[in-house]
Structures are given as C-alpha cells and as structure tokens.
Amino acid sequence: MSADPAEPVYRNPVLDADWSDPDVIRVGDDFYLTASSFGRVPGLPLLHSRDLVNWTLVGHALQRLEPESEFAAPRHDCGVWAPSLRHHDGRFWIFWGDPDRGVFQVNAPEIRGPWTRPHLVKAGKGLIDPCPLWDDETGEAYLVHAWAKSRSGVKNRLTGHRMHPHGTELLDEGKVIVDGDRIPGWFTLEGPKLYRHDGWFWIFAPAGGVETGWQGAFRSRAFFGPYEEKVVLEQKDTDVNGPHQGGWVRTPSGEDWFLHFQQRGAYGRVVHLQPMRWGGGGGTSRSWGSPRSSGAESGGEAESGGGWPVIGDDGAPVAEHRRPDLPPQPPAAPATDDDFPGGRPGRQWQWTANPRDGWATHHSADGLRLTCVRTPDAHDLRALPNVLTQRLPGTPCTVEVDLRLDDGEPGARAGLAVLGDAYSWIGLQRGPDGTVRLVHRFAETVADQERDAAPPRPAPGGRARLRVDIDAGARCRFSYDTGDTGDTANTADTGDGAGQGGFRPSGQVFAATPWRWVGALLGLVALAPTGQGHAGTATFTQFRIRIQEKRADR
C-alpha cells in the first residue's frame, strides 16, 4: 500500500471482524453504522466514523432483548437480523426483523440515545431485513422487507408496504414488488436497502447466498413497481467471495460509497468499503443479460434508462483504493483491550443472553469480577447465558488475560474461551480438595459435552495468565503461565518475559468454527455446578489482543 500523502489509500476490509449485515448513513460530517447482533446483549451496535475507513464503537441501541423470557438462554440465530439505520425528522431510526416475531423499530434524538423501547411495527413469522423510506418528494413513507423460509416457507422475494409517517405501523398487507423466482439465476434474494435517487425508487439487495452471492440493484419510477434489475457487484476474479449486502452513502462533496460484508468462515462477516458512481448503464450483468422487469405483477416493462450504480472496479470488489474525499482522521478501530475499570466491561463486550443481576460485581478497583453462576449446563458453554463475549479479530492475533479464581466451592471454574459450533477454553477449576488446577477443555460440533484437551495441572495461588494464539486459518493454540517455576516441561519461549515460568503450550491446535450466521467469539466465563449458596467469584484483569501481522496504514 502506498504511503504517499499525495495518494492516500485504504485497504479492505475496513472493519476486520464480524460486523454482520452493515447499514450506514451520514448526518452532517459524521457517518454511522449498525449491524446484526442476533441473540447477543446489548444489541444493535452503533459505530461512528468521520472518513468511512476508521470506525469506533460508540454504543448500542438495544439494551435488552424482548420478550425477556425468550432470551433468558442463548438463541444464537434469533433476535436482531439485518437492521436498517436512517435519520429522519431530527431522529435516528433503526428497523430490524426478528424472524420469529416481526418487524421492530427503535428511535432516538442522538446516536448515543436515549433510545426508545422496541416497538412492534408488524407482527409475523419470517419478516426479515426491513428498510424504511420517507419520500420527501411525495410525503409518503414506505417499507420493504425480505422473507426467511425457515419461519414462513417463503423466500427469494421482496414485499413492499406503505408505512405510517410516524414509523409506527404499516398501512396495508403488502405487495410482492420483486419476485426473485421470476429472474433467471436469482435465488435467496434478501437484505434490501431502499433509497430515492434521480426520480427513481432504488432497492439495493443481495442474492445468491451468504458465501457466494452478489449485489443487485433494482429501480422503478413507482414504489410498487415494476422494477428492473442489474448485478452491480460480484466476486469476478478477486479473492472476495460473496461481496454483498450493505448500504450506500454519499459524502458532503458528492462522492458515493458502498459498505458491504464478506463471509470469512470463523471470522464472520467482515466489512469492505467500495467506491461507487452512477453511470449510464453501468454495473455488471450475469448470463441473463440486460436490465429486465422483475415485478411480480408488473403489467408491463419498467422504463429503461441510464444511471445505474457502478460499484468497486467496474463491478468487482477492490482490495485497496484511494481514500474518500474527507478530512484525514487518526487510525481508529473498535476497542478490544480492557482493564475493566470499576469492574465494568467495555462496550465491546456482549452477553450471550439477557444478563441477570449479580453476574458481574462493580467495585472500586480494576478487573472484571464474575460470579461463578450455578448451572446444570456446566458441561457445555454453548448453552450458558452468562458468557461475556467479543468478536474474534479477522487477522492473526494473540489474546491474553489474567485470571484469579477467588474463594469458592469445589467445581467452581472460570476461563477464556473461543466459542462457536465447536469450542475450547482454558482456565482454572477448584478441585474436591480445595486446590486450584489449570484445566483445558473442548467440545466438538456434534458433541453435547466437553472433555479434556490436556491433563489438569497445578495452579499455585489460584492464578494464571491465559493465552490464545490465533493464526490466519483461525487455528488456535492455547497456552498458560501459572508462575510455577517447578513446571518447566514444554515451556514455550515467548520472549516476552511473561511470568517466571513463561508460557506453556496446552493441548492440540483447535480450529475455531462459526455459529449459525455468527462468527466465532472470544468469551470470558465463570460457572459452578448446581447446588446451594454462593459458589465463589473469578476476577479477570488486563485483557489484551495483540495483532501479530501489522497492516499498512489504514
């Protein structure tokens, strides 16, 4: 990448972690982004940027998932799907689909809140990926959404509605305005984003599936159609598989840009920034050729004309590109490290379900103090609601945290985990004799119970520094430092002087896996078997993520 200030460039992805199904807007000189959060809490992350390249996490719009009882336990593929972020009438609005309940919205006067409680706009099964539009030209409000076949038996179509201007309800039963089954070669049409531009209604919507899909654009002079379609972004001969589903944004100087995701296995859906322009008949076409009508009941062909969006390098994603014409900003990224001041986790952390009082204790010093929550599911971390998680970085990295297992009863344990359909964790557990041992366990995708990845080892003092080295294939190597100079076997020479004994490798290499729709997660957890009374606490300090391969200037 060039470092010449006269030709500054950025490199994709601009958000190298699982920020799934992004949508973006500009308000004044500020850009804001939100993403899917599924069953994690808090939900609806809110990111801010001044240059579309450097982003920081500034909060969440959804503090708890409703109904409370349904999200008391993990529901990793439920909850918040593919939100749309808009700014209208002086307020920020986020609409999303809960595939089991319907279309919801929250709104706020400022991006940091306060946000309203979720309002159900339309109840129904399988209503996903909603996007509103307040049309300044006509004064009307509209909403388009896709369908989840797993809940409704319907997919590959987009349904349009008239919406109350207050965004509180839909005013009709809806009409299919784009039927993917009528477009040769199109399948899994979803994720629509609705815009008004140059006298047209525009729907940017992906198709073809998460890993191998493409980005489509649809346009019509009337909201209810008929629409004609074009493929405007696809992999071509690049390394970016399935470049699709995201949002269009325009800078103050009039430049157009498109943010979208790429599915990268255990790393989840990382976010790319593509240049965009409006050209005469631009974009790309697949084997079915030129723009054509895709309305379900069009009654005739849509009006043709120029001015289609051209995204990336003539419809192919770019690996690097000239920066947007915006004031230079210092390098920034969503926070990962945490000292847990006052016992409070940073905003990058999310629980795997609605949290309960007492899981984390606030105090005057640094360090996250977690209660060893009693559970009948101590054999399977995937079933626990009290795992505190953050996203797995998309580049090779080293993750470390200090852990102290405080006074507790036999069976109390805590540790650092890499979670997905399969998982592995390393940590401390108190034995029947009251001593603390270093334990390392894992569970395969098909297993419903974990087992030892390495034999337990003594942990004098009930403390350890835990480490996971994660390479380019999301292969994880666990190690630990208990400060025990007597255990010199298999000592790893890390060269960082950590602890008197140094880090010692533990177990075999573990391949991180995604969950359904979600990339692998890093997790901190404290638990205990069922029983009566307080089971003890665990304290985590100095959580650090160190990127192993330095990227060029962003």
Q: How would you name each of these model-derived features?
A:
Residues 1-487, 493-554:
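Carbohydrate-active catalytic/glycan-binding domains of CAZyme proteins
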